[in-house]
A protein has these predicted regions:
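N-terminal membrane/targeting module of cytochrome P450s
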Residues: 1-74, 369, 381, 386-401
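C-terminal regulatory or interaction extensions
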Residues: 224-232, 242-401
């Protein structure tokens, strides 16, 4: 018989208490100290408590292997890209990830919004952009206290959620009043009922996050579930939880896998929500096996999108490089054209001439002369005069399309 969740077995008239004991007594089962009260019709049942556990079924082991195999593909292709293409690729993937994590919660943000925040302009999204930028720079948060969770939250949302008085945290560190999650008019989840409970459960979570004998991918999935179960804030819990998940993946797998999480979740919003709801159901008794399996499948979908994008753009860049080599251009002109081509292929944001000067170590005056020659041959076109911005021209664009 295929491995099924306890709720399904209950409706098939199995003795789920007996089946639960079999699963808990299995020597391969990971039993955590993380405790939940199951949720029925959006309300927690304080009278029932279960320790979260999971069983590493064969499909989970297969999915883990696939994630590490995909990560090797990602890093192999990425390492073949020139420096500028790498930078622009990470920046573009990060921007898309922020847009998607916002959109999952119904928060609309555009590439222009995120790009402006990235370029030091203070906006409502500056906090979340700066935090994701830290992931790309390898400055990965390690959390050791509930105070650090609150600080990260403030850093992300002080110019956004916390501007609204309704979202102000009225406890010592977190919310002190109940919060409910609704799907339309139906209540589907309630966070922990008091700040005391929130702090106690977050301390348990931090302890779990920092233990060494749990596989990092499994730990990331369990942490994500339990953080969202607690729901310590009035708003922003989903985005905060996915940010923590991205940190885990960036640290333990690779940066681009970490930055494709929300993209994949956005494509699987119904599945994502269902994973949470089913795990919290009373008849599933705190089993995380299917939540972990589902989240690993979502991670793989994000990786596959990254691999497809990298393969396509890497081939296009190789073709462009060979084309540029065949042109009768000076070394400087070829370098300028290749840099602009990298930016065109890997980024939707224009490259300012001032930035271009830094990449090729030329003065603005000398750059202007080379740009003039390239423009005369239709290899380069002017995008903006203030600030001065150029991109590849139609002649090269037609070659790449």
């Amino acid at each position: 018989m295929a491995y099924q969740n306890l709720k399904t077995l209950y409706y098939k008239k199995y003795n789920i208490e007996e089946e639960l004991n079999k699963r808990l007594e299995n020597p391969c089962t990971l039993k955590t100290e993380l405790v939940i009260s199951p949720v029925i019709k959006g309300e927690k049942l304080p009278s029932e408590k279960y320790n979260l556990f999971y069983l590493p079924i064969n499909n989970i082991l297969f999915l883990e292997e696939q994630i590490f195999s995909n990560s090797k593909k990602v890093t192999d292709i990425f390492s073949q890209l020139p420096y500028i293409a790498q930078n622009k690729c990470i920046e573009e993937v990060m921007i898309n990830e922020i847009i998607k994590t916002n959109k999952i919660e119904g928060v609309i943000s555009t590439k222009k919004d995120i790009s402006e925040s990235l370029n030091t302009k203070k906006t409502r999204f500056s906090g979340i952009v700066n935090k994701y930028k830290e992931i790309t720079e390898g400055n990965l948060e390690k959390i050791n206290s509930v105070e650090e969770i609150r600080k990260i939250y403030d850093d992300i949302f002080k110019e956004d959620i916390l501007k609204n008085p309704e979202n102000e945290l009225d406890g010592k560190l977190f919310r002190k009043n109940p919060v409910y999650i609704q799907d339309g008019i139906k209540k589907i989840h309630s966070g922990s009922l008091s700040e005391e409970a929130i702090i106690s459960q977050l301390n348990d979570l931090i302890k779990f996050m920092n233990i060494k004998n749990v596989n990092s991918l499994i730990k990331a999935c369990i942490t994500h579930y339990y953080f969202e179960y607690i729901h310590p804030f009035y708003d922003g819990n989903g985005r905060f939880g996915r940010f923590l998940f991205s940190i885990y993946l960036a640290r333990k797998i690779d940066i681009l896998t970490g930055l494709s999480l929300s993209y994949a979740i956005f494509l699987n919003k119904e599945k994502y929500l269902k994973l949470f709801l089913e795990t919290s159901e009373s008849k599933n008794c705190g089993e995380l096996t299917f939540f972990i399996e589902g989240m690993l499948e979502i991670i793989i979908q994000g990786q596959e999108s990254i691999i497809g994008m990298l393969e396509k753009k890497h081939l296009k860049l190789e073709y462009a490089l060979n084309y540029i080599k065949e042109l009768e251009l000076s070394v400087e002109e070829s370098d300028i054209l290749f840099i602009l081509t990298q930016n065109y292929i890997f980024s939707n944001s224009p490259l300012k001439d001032s930035e271009l000067c830094k990449y090729i170590n030329l003065s603005p005056y000398k750059l202007k002369g080379y740009i003039k020659k390239l423009s005369e041959e239709s290899y380069v076109e002017t995008i903006s005069r203030r600030p001065l911005i150029h991109s590849i021209g139609d002649k090269l664009k037609n070659v790449l399309e």
